Design a protein with these regions (language model features):
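Small beta-barrel nucleic-acid-binding modules, primarily SNase/OB-fold domains
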Residues: 2-221
Length: 221
């Protein structure tokens, strides 16, 4: 009688442990696959570089920036709608693997991530390769930054997407900031305030972009 109770108790314990392990395995598969730090399914595509997952998490693609779409009464930028449409085609409703940038969130609280489809397609890179995004440096992981920079250089050479647009008010030179990886027009107050040891001069807008610097938001070089 005593041993029957012991055996029944152990059977119950084993069953409970088994169920716990099953739940743990399922939970783990929803957050980490193939080395990704998170996993999620896309509910909504906001624009070319931002998505919302089914759990409500907002994700900003690390190291890239796409043109703005019309919002809050503001007009959209050239290729903004095309970038969003391309992003939708890539990710809408799909499961994604996310690898977080060194700085995991931006000042809006969005996750900063390198995003991959289940077949390994690098979403950030696809947008850059097609000329729908330019580089903007976060706390970048070197391996992805170098890949994205090479893709941008190729898109620049081929004048794809945003790189097919004429340069607005070209300058004789541009001022870059080696600390922020941003470049400005020569008369821009933000460029002029750059410390001498951080300042770099580019002969053209193309040269600044080729080196991975992003255009300043105020003077829009």
């Amino acid at each position: 009688m005593y041993w029957n109770k012991i055996n029944a108790l152990w059977a119950s314990v084993r069953k409970t442990v088994f169920l716990v392990l099953i739940v743990f395995a399922c939970t783990s598969s929803a957050t980490a696959v193939n080395g990704a730090e998170r996993r999620g399914r896309v509910r909504w595509v906001v624009d070319g570089d931002t998505i919302v997952l089914t759990d409500g998490e907002r994700v900003r693609y690390a190291d890239i920036n796409t043109p703005e779409v019309a919002h809050d009464g503001e007009s959209g930028e050239p290729y903004g709608d095309e970038a969003r449409a391309f992003n939708q085609k890539l990710v809408q409703g799909r499961w994604l693997n996310l690898e977080l940038a060194e700085e995991s969130r931006d000042h809006y609280g969005r996750l900063l991530a390198y995003v991959f489809l289940e077949d390994g397609t690098f979403v950030n890179g696809e947008l850059v390769q097609q000329g729908y995004a330019h580089l903007i440096r976060h706390q970048s992981k070197v391996v992805y930054w170098e890949k994205l920079l090479n893709l941008q250089r190729q898109a620049l050479k081929e004048k794809k997407g945003i790189w097919s647009l004429p340069v607005s008010k070209p300058e004789k030179y541009y001022l870059g900031n080696k600390r922020t990886w941003v470049f400005h027009r020569p008369d821009c107050q933000f460029g002029l305030k750059t410390a001498e040891h951080n300042r770099v001069v580019f002969k053209s807008r193309y040269e600044a972009l080729y080196q991975g610097f992003s255009p300043g938001r105020r003077c829009k070089p």
